[in-house]
């Protein structure tokens, strides 16, 4: 009987040891796994035309899924098409002027300028000789001082005409001045810039989706006259999907960039999403009121941004998420 009692006692001791060991192992596993609480953070963007005008058409409505590169809406293109035509004409004029400056003067123009110099030289010689004769007559008191002054004036005018013709011939032979060529080139570049701006304005009168997403709001309707930058749509981006969470300083070493984690939602507690820490704030901040934690050991925390690598449409903006660290979550 005593032997049986001893055996039973030993069995109880062994069983208690097994239970205690199992509990210790379970607790150690729990202690090694950090748990944080955060919320889904999906970026939204306000889409607008970069230029103003009358809304011609809108191709999507609230709730529609959109794809990157999809045409979402258009303004009335006519004003921008007219501006583009004017800019092209301006480039043509400036290009022609610049080409003329580079080419210089034709042989025919140089010959005409040389002939003008000869004609001006002959006129000057005649005026100079006439003045000389009038000067002699004035000395002999044959003509008045007024007659002499008229002869001098005619001589001076002929001299000025000759100098102008000589300067023009010299310019024709040497070509256009570098300053004039540079000015013509600058005018051409300005016209080309205006053309590029006109092309861009016409392009921006069509609103293109920058990325995949879901249309949340449609702020205007066709016929609305918009100023540039006026919001037309608000879009929730499909990617990336992040979880915003906070970690205290004591556990900061476990939350390093690249660390993989599991993300649990109330809707699928047995099928976690997978995430990877992409950003850890370099500065501490006071615990936000929205943070849900079972035990905050400090008022200062560090913000985490966790990228959800297998996100789907079930994740919604602001949805609460449990972030589980541990060996099962894996590391980089």
From Swiss-Prot:
The keyword Coiled coil applies. GO terms for cellular component: periplasmic space. It is found in: Periplasm. Keywords: Coiled coil, Periplasm, Signal. Gene3D superfamilies: 2.40.30.170, 2.40.50.100, Helix hairpin bin. Residues 1-16 form the signal peptide. NCBIfam families: PRK03598.1. PANTHER family: EFFLUX SYSTEM COMPONENT YKNX-RELATED, UPF0194 MEMBRANE PROTEIN YBHG. This is UPF0194 membrane protein YbhG. The gene is ybhG.
């Amino acid at each position: 009987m005593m032997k049986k009692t001893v055996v039973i006692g030993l069995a109880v001791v062994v069983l208690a040891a097994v239970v205690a060991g199992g509990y210790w192992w379970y607790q150690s596993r729990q202690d090694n796994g950090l748990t944080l609480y955060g919320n889904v953070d999906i970026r939204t963007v306000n889409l607008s035309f970069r230029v103003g005008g009358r809304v011609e058409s809108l191709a999507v409505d609230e709730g529609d899924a959109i794809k990157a590169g999809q045409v979402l809406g258009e303004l009335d293109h006519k004003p921008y098409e007219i501006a583009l035509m004017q800019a092209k004409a301006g480039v043509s004029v400036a290009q022609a002027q610049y080409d003329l400056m580079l080419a210089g003067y034709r042989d025919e123009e140089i010959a005409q300028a040389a002939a003008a110099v000869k004609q001006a030289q002959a006129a000057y010689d005649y005026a100079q000789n006439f003045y000389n004769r009038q000067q002699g007559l004035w000395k002999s008191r044959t003509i008045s001082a007024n007659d002499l002054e008229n002869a001098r004036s005619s001589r001076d005018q002929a001299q000025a005409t000759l100098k102008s013709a000589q300067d023009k011939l010299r310019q024709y032979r040497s070509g256009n001045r570098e300053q004039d060529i540079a000015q013509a080139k600058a005018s051409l570049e300005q016209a080309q810039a205006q053309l590029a701006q006109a092309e861009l304005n016409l392009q921006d009168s069509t609103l293109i989706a920058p990325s995949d997403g879901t249309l949340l709001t449609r702020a205007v309707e066709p016929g609305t006259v918009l100023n540039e930058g006026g919001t037309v749509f608000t879009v929730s981006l499909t990617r990336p999907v992040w979880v915003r969470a906070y970690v205290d300083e004591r556990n900061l070493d476990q939350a390093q960039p690249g660390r993989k984690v599991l993300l649990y939602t109330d809707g699928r507690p047995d099928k976690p999403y997978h995430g990877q820490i992409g950003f850890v704030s370099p500065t501490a901040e006071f615990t936000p009121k929205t943070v849900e934690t079972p035990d905050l050991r400090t008022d200062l925390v560090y913000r985490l941004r966790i990228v959800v690598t297998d996100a789907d449409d079930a994740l919604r903006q602001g949805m609460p998420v449990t972030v589980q660290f541990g060996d099962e979550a894996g590391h980089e």
